[in-house]
Swiss-Prot record:
It is found in: Cell inner membrane. Residues 6-238 form the ABC transporter domain. Keywords: ATP-binding, Cell inner membrane, Cell membrane, Membrane, Nucleotide-binding, Translocase, Transport. Belongs to the ABC transporter superfamily. Spermidine/putrescine importer (TC 3.A.1.11.1) family. Gene3D superfamilies: 2.40.50.100, Nucleic acid-binding proteins (2.40.50.140), P-loop containing nucleotide triphosphate hydrolases (3.40.50.300). ATP binds at G40, P41, S42, G43, C44, G45, K46, T47. This is Spermidine/putrescine import ATP-binding protein PotA. The complex is composed of two ATP-binding proteins (PotA), two transmembrane proteins (PotB and PotC) and a solute-binding protein (PotD). It is a peripheral membrane protein.
Amino acid sequence: MDNCILEIKNLSHYYDNNGNKTLDNINLKIKKNEFITLLGPSGCGKTTLIKILGGFLSQKNGEIYFFSKEISKTSPNKREINTVFQNYALFPHMNVFDNISFGLRMKKTPKDIIKEKVKTSLSLIGMPKYAYRNINELSGGQKQRVAIARAMVMEPKLLLLDEPLSALDLKMRQEMQKELKKIQRQLGITFIYVTHDQEEALTMSDRIVVMNEGIILQIGTPEEIYNEPKTKFVADFIGESNIFDGTYKKELVVSLLGHEFECLDKGFEAEEAVDLVIRPEDVKLLPKGKGHLSGTITSAIFQGVHYEMTLEIQKTNWIVQSTRLTKVGEEVDIFLEPDDIHVMHKE
């Protein structure tokens, strides 16, 4: 991989002496200036991986190369890697300026350089007039920005962010997502971001690493992860999905509920049992008799930007999202284009 700055090779970690693994044979390459997100449910190993990369935890086996140098034995303060934690870890007895400048002062950086770097950092996070505010006077979003500024002022080659926005309300979280992406682009620093929030990962990332039970299930762009999931878990975890049992009848044709549909996926045997993934927003509703399969709307909920409806077809429930409401009890048909159906091998 061109411009690779971090390479993780065959890395494993055990959480007890019985061989139970938190991380199982992790292999990953990360590029310079990349915003990469580790995404998965609680307990999947993503925070453990961040702690190992930051030097706060040691792996059982495997290697970590940072700019081609093995750093497993390198102490955290010598790695040129900084970490922003979920709880901010700010010093409550220091003001904003002193919090941001703490690392620089520990390195005995000249005062005039410290002043200039802090000024630049405050401007970057949109808080130029907050240098001498007390930490307890700040909102949650402002505290998070200060924590990020404190990490960035050290000019790390790599910034690790462990669920930094999880304590914020929805609106503030969305605003900070935009700010973080903007800051990352301006500085050209590589970000490794940890979250269990699928929307957050899809919004911010250049690439997403989907993890579960200590292993990497899929690596790809947000578009690849959403539109081309490789496993049932990924399809179900990233957004809402309709996942049905189907049959790959022949090349570019699948069978679902007795109807044959055209598809775009290849690489399957004739008559192979497969999983079919259909996103709720891709299901088109038509008047009865005009589509592929017929069913009845059994529920409808308004969710702000669209209606989410449940459609029963041959005793299977389909989630359908549309800006147009179809009333409960109404009989309709569905219509699917070839690119609305994603075919996966059975696990």
